[in-house]
Regions:
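A compositional/biophysical signature of low hydrophobicity enriched in polar/charged and small residues
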Residues: 1-100
Length: 100
């Protein structure tokens, strides 16, 4: 591998947990479904989940930088009516169980 290839931009995965106001699930569901796969430059959405417990929804996404990850959460998710808190976690794969 050349030095140029080894310095290529690495894509980081993130999990954004979303807490909403009581009785606001329907209002958040629609904007989540309307996001495109690339809601902003440098961010690619993978999956969205409804979860149980302290958090209500989770969005799994990739970003080419921490800055773009912060912009996506701050400029897109947090501005959705009913969102009261977010918690974004960068992820590092330790094992991919889908691969032998």
């Amino acid at each position: 591998m050349s030095a140029v290839n080894s310095l290529a931009k690495q894509v980081q995965k993130y999990l954004a947990l979303i807490k909403i106001s009581p009785n606001m699930a329907a209002k958040l569901y629609e904007p989540l479904m309307e996001f495109t796969e690339n809601p902003i430059e440098g961010v690619k959405l993978e999956e969205a989940y409804q979860v149980f417990g302290k958090w209500d929804f989770a969005v799994l996404f990739e970003a080419d930088s921490n800055v773009n990850a912060l912009h996506f959460v701050g400029d897109k998710i947090r501005l959705v009516e009913g969102v009261v808190a977010t918690y974004t976690v960068p992820l590092s794969t330790i094992k991919d169980y889908r691969k032998p």
